[in-house]
Amino acid sequence: MINQKKIAGEKACEWIKDGMVVGLGTGSTVYYTIEKLGEMVNNGLHITGVATSEETNKQAQNLGIPLKSLNDVTEIDITIDGADEIDTDFQGIKGGGGALLREKMVASASLKNIWVVSEEKLVRNLGKFPLPLEVIPFGWKQVERKLEKEHIQTNLRKQSSGEVYVTNNGNYILDIVNQTFTDAEMWQEKLAQIPGIVEHGLFLHYVDIIICAKANGEIELIKK
């Protein structure tokens, strides 16, 4: 069986050159990117990684990839990350893994952003996947109520144990469901006006290259 995620994830490593500062995304596809980068580092590649989550940080450390915090780098040469959805206008939803705030901060500091996806992540309109909102625990119910007044349905994200999911930053996540984001710019502006929302999962002006792996194993490169 063809592993689309592995194909897309490993393909992105072709953009990595010696001496680069590399943003390391979070998720099941970029997992394979990081595994491949670990092999390349062990074979003599010199890079510095900037992790977008504790999960990625641990994986990179175990593979021997040198790491720095975002505070300790001036800029990032290239960031490789996954996506939950992306449309033909290069607008995406991220944050299914809960790392949206750090992912967006790293993406913003990057000269180039590559997203690695399998073909079902390419959509005509955003919204099949829930849109995550990272909210502070203090008063999160107020955020939920404000959205309800706008007829926006949300679910508080929970772990499989039933406990509330807590991000690496100590925050909660509200997932907007049953919504289509045809005017993503409007949504971005709307959400920015609600106190308590730390960040949202709309990534509108970040990605430069999409590496899409198809079911037959072929790779499609989509560039701006």
Curated annotation (Swiss-Prot):
Pathway: Carbohydrate degradation; pentose phosphate pathway; D-ribose 5-phosphate from D-ribulose 5-phosphate (non-oxidative stage): step 1/1. Its EC number is 5.3.1.6. The keyword Isomerase applies. Substrate binds at residues 26-29, 81-84, 94-97, 121. Keywords: Isomerase. The active site is at residue 103. It is an enzyme of class 5 (isomerase). GO terms for molecular function: ribose-5-phosphate isomerase activity. Homodimer. Belongs to the ribose 5-phosphate isomerase family. This is Ribose-5-phosphate isomerase A. It comes from Listeria monocytogenes serovar 1/2a (strain ATCC BAA-679 / EGD-e).
